[in-house]
Amino acid sequence: MSLRRPSKEQPKNFEFNSTSLEAAKAIIKKYPKGRQQSAVMALLYIAQKQNSNWIPLAAMKYIGKFLDMPYIKVYEVATFYTMYNLSPVGNFFVQVCTTTPCMLRGANKLVEACKEKISEKESELSSDKNCSWMEVECLGACVNAPMMQINDDYYEDLDKKKTLEILDVILQGGTPKPGSYRGRVNNEPENIRKTLMDLKNA
C-alpha cells in the first residue's frame, strides 16, 4: 500500500463540468482507438484543477468509467505521482523548492514566510482553508533560485520580504504576477551584460 493515502474526508460524487469534459474529450481524441487509457494522467490533472487542486476517490472512479479502465489502475497512477494531491490543499497550493541551489540562495527564508503567513506545519490548510504549503524537491528553475510554485506558476528570484508580499496577495484572494522578482527576463544575467556581444565593450 502506498504511503500517500487519500484523505479520510471524501465527497460522495464527482463528474466533469462542461469545461473539463470538453478538455477531456479533446485529449482522448489524440490517442488511437483502444488506447484511450493512455490519457489517464491528463484526465487526473483536469480533475485536480476542477476540484480545488486535489483528487478525491470519486474522481478516480469517475475517470475509470470514463476511460473504461479498472478503478484500481487509476488509483495506482494517482497515488504514485506526487503531482497529484490526495487531500485538500486549498485554492492556492504553494510549493517551496528547498533543494541545494535554492537552499544556498535562501530558501529557508521562503519557508519561514510560509510558516508565518499560511500555517506552522506543511500540508496544513490556512485558517481560511484557502491555502497550504509544502517543501518540494527541485522544480527545475535553479538559475532563478530561490523560487516557489503556486498552482501552475513559478515565482522566482525571491527573498523573504517578496515572499510575504506574494502570500499576502493570495491570502486576500488575488493572483500575484508570476516570474522573476528581481526584474529579470526569464533567466537572463542580472548585470548589464546580457549576451556575448555585450563583452565587446567590456
Tell where the protein language model's regions lie, with residue ranges:
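Signature of N-terminal electron-transfer/Fe-S-associated modules in redox systems
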Residues: 1-202
